[in-house]
């Protein structure tokens, strides 16, 4: 009987210890930028945290080809992103997609970017004295 109690307590302790080691995150965190893909979640109001997505969803993305340069696209155009100070977005093609979704708003914002941060699975591109930012989320695809 004593052996069963000790075995039961040991099992309970191991089970509890194993649960304590469980990672408590529902996303993957990249350790480097090269090779990672990022999708725009939306425009964030830094004071309230409210996210306003840009239409059409999934149309504003990029993938890093080095630690400071990424290639991607908007609704119809191709773009290059440079992580400099300030960050710099270049629209490589000039197909008129200003009428598609929120592309015109996106183009106005990227001309005024001031700084960026990379924290875990988020890239934030700040503008308007850091009152707002473009929030990009790491994408596994």
Residue spans for each PLM region:
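Sec-dependent bacterial lipoprotein signal peptides
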Residues: 1-19
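Lipid interaction determinants
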Residues: 21-141
């Amino acid at each position: 009987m004593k052996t069963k109690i000790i075995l039961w307590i040991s099992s309970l302790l191991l089970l509890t210890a194993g649960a304590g080691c469980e990672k408590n995150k529902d996303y993957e965190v990249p350790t480097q930028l090269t090779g990672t893909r990022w999708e725009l979640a939306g425009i964030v109001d830094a004071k309230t945290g409210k996210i306003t997505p840009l239409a059409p969803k999934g149309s504003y993305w990029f993938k890093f080809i080095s630690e400071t340069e990424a290639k991607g696209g908007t609704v119809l155009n191709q773009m290059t992103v440079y992580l400099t100070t300030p960050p710099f977005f270049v629209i490589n093609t000039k197909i008129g997609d200003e009428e598609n979704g929120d592309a015109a708003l996106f183009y106005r914002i990227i001309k005024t970017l001031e700084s960026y941060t990379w924290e875990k699975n988020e890239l934030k591109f700040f503008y308007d004295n850091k009152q707002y930012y473009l929030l990009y989320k790491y994408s596994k695809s």
